[in-house]
């Protein structure tokens, strides 16, 4: 006890020692769904309907490149999945775990734009309790959700692990790190990552307690794939120090991207974001 900081002591005695409680306080802000999925009579084909709040930025032709379906997780929830065919000759598919306050409808335009610019297809999914997915968002469900997405990507589309880039943004780095620590892939990209829930809420926390949530810091050293970390230096939600700490623990780090002046939600608006991704996907992965 003598080695604990004041903030750690406060957390220890004031917060219930339960990862789920910490997670619910910190992490999950599911929006009202911005899309619906309608199934045909055969039960095998799903149609995506976007609401105005999805802010779709492309034509119906681009929308035809999006395939959606539902799959079941090991926890019994049915989650919505989205496969975006951005490029006919794409070597890699990004398995994209999005942030905590959006759903697939809101992300669909971003996926089209990103994939077409870096020549990758994109596979994504909604966490339990988000969008059309059933259940509730919890830490355990996050891990089951990404596992189900990984299995669907591999079995439904026949995509091999060496052609999958695991990509996580913000809270999405939590399922991404967990998956990448258990399965090898072409690469891992962590965009505005966190070290753990306690370390976000209490920045002076120096170690992982049994009741901490989202312990990326303890899992990242188990990742054997190349890891690219991207973080804004002025991140007001997850401090830049989290990206640095994770980078230092990587087995196979590549040159990170520290975006000078960027916050938590605008990294992708800086030109060097796309430049770094293009370089990583089209040049560096070939030689790794």
From Swiss-Prot:
<keyword id="KW-0628">Postsynaptic cell membrane</keyword>
<feature type="active site" description="Charge relay system">
    <location>
        <position position="235"/>
    </location>
</feature>
<keyword id="KW-1003">Cell membrane</keyword>
<dbReference type="GO" id="GO:0008474">
    <property type="term" value="F:palmitoyl-(protein) hydrolase activity"/>
</dbReference>
<keyword id="KW-0472">Membrane</keyword>
<dbReference type="GO" id="GO:0014069">
    <property type="term" value="C:postsynaptic density"/>
</dbReference>
<feature type="active site" description="Charge relay system">
    <location>
        <position position="170"/>
    </location>
</feature>
<dbReference type="GO" id="GO:0098944">
    <property type="term" value="C:postsynaptic recycling endosome membrane"/>
</dbReference>
<dbReference type="GO" id="GO:1905668">
    <property type="term" value="P:positive regulation of protein localization to endosome"/>
</dbReference>
<dbReference type="InterPro" id="IPR022742">
    <property type="entry name" value="Hydrolase_4"/>
</dbReference>
<dbReference type="GO" id="GO:0098839">
    <property type="term" value="C:postsynaptic density membrane"/>
</dbReference>
<dbReference type="GO" id="GO:0002084">
    <property type="term" value="P:protein depalmitoylation"/>
</dbReference>
<dbReference type="GO" id="GO:1902950">
    <property type="term" value="P:regulation of dendritic spine maintenance"/>
</dbReference>
<dbReference type="InterPro" id="IPR029058">
    <property type="entry name" value="AB_hydrolase_fold"/>
</dbReference>
<feature type="modified residue" description="Phosphoserine">
    <location>
        <position position="282"/>
    </location>
</feature>
<keyword id="KW-0966">Cell projection</keyword>
<dbReference type="Pfam" id="PF12146">
    <property type="entry name" value="Hydrolase_4"/>
</dbReference>
<dbReference type="GO" id="GO:0005886">
    <property type="term" value="C:plasma membrane"/>
</dbReference>
<dbReference type="GO" id="GO:0043197">
    <property type="term" value="C:dendritic spine"/>
</dbReference>
<feature type="active site" description="Charge relay system">
    <location>
        <position position="264"/>
    </location>
</feature>
<keyword id="KW-0449">Lipoprotein</keyword>
<comment type="similarity">
    <text>Belongs to the AB hydrolase superfamily. ABHD17 family.</text>
</comment>
<comment type="function">
    <text>Hydrolyzes fatty acids from S-acylated cysteine residues in proteins. Has depalmitoylating activity towards DLG4/PSD95. Has depalmitoylating activity towards GAP43. Has depalmitoylating activity towards MAP6. Has depalmitoylating activity towards NRAS.</text>
</comment>
<dbReference type="GO" id="GO:1902473">
    <property type="term" value="P:regulation of protein localization to synapse"/>
</dbReference>
<keyword id="KW-0597">Phosphoprotein</keyword>
<keyword id="KW-0564">Palmitate</keyword>
<dbReference type="GO" id="GO:1902817">
    <property type="term" value="P:negative regulation of protein localization to microtubule"/>
</dbReference>
<keyword id="KW-0770">Synapse</keyword>
<keyword id="KW-0967">Endosome</keyword>
<keyword id="KW-0378">Hydrolase</keyword>
<dbReference type="GO" id="GO:0055038">
    <property type="term" value="C:recycling endosome membrane"/>
</dbReference>
<dbReference type="GO" id="GO:0098978">
    <property type="term" value="C:glutamatergic synapse"/>
</dbReference>
<protein>
    <recommendedName>
        <fullName>Alpha/beta hydrolase domain-containing protein 17B</fullName>
        <ecNumber>3.1.2.22</ecNumber>
    </recommendedName>
</protein>
């Amino acid at each position: 006890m003598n080695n604990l900081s004041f903030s750690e002591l406060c957390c220890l005695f004031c917060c219930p020692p339960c990862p789920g409680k910490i997670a619910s306080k910190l992490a999950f802000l599911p929006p009202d769904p911005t899309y619906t999925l309608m199934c045909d009579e055969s039960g095998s084909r799903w149609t995506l309907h976007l609401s105005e709040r999805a802010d779709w930025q492309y034509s119906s032709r681009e929308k035809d490149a999006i395939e959606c379906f539902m799959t079941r997780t090991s926890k019994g929830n049915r989650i919505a999945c989205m496969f975006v065919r951005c490029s006919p000759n794409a070597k890699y598919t990004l398995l994209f775990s999005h942030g905590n306050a959006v759903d697939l409808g809101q992300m669909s335009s971003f996926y089209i734009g990103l994939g077409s610019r870096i020549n990758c297809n994109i596979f994504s999914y909604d966490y339990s309790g988000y969008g059309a997915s059933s259940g509730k968002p919890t830490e355990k469900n996050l891990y089951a959700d990404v596992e189900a997405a990984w299995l669907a990507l591999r079995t439904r589309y026949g995509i091999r692990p060496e052609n999958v880039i695991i990509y996580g943004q913000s809270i999405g780095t939590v399922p991404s790190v967990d998956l990448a620590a258990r399965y090898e892939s072409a690469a891992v990209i962590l965009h505005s990552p966190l070290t753990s829930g306690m370390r976000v809420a209490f920045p002076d926390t120096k170690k992982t307690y049994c009741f901490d949530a989202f312990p990326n810091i303890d899992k990242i050293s188990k990742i054997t794939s190349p890891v690219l970390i991207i973080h804004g230096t002025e991140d007001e939600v997850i401090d830049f120090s989290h990206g640095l700490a994770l980078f230092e623990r990587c087995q196979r780090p590549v040159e990170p991207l520290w975006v000078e002046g960027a916050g938590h939600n605008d990294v992708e608006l800086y030109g060097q974001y796309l430049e770094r991704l293009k370089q990583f996907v089209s040049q560096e992965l070939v030689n790794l």
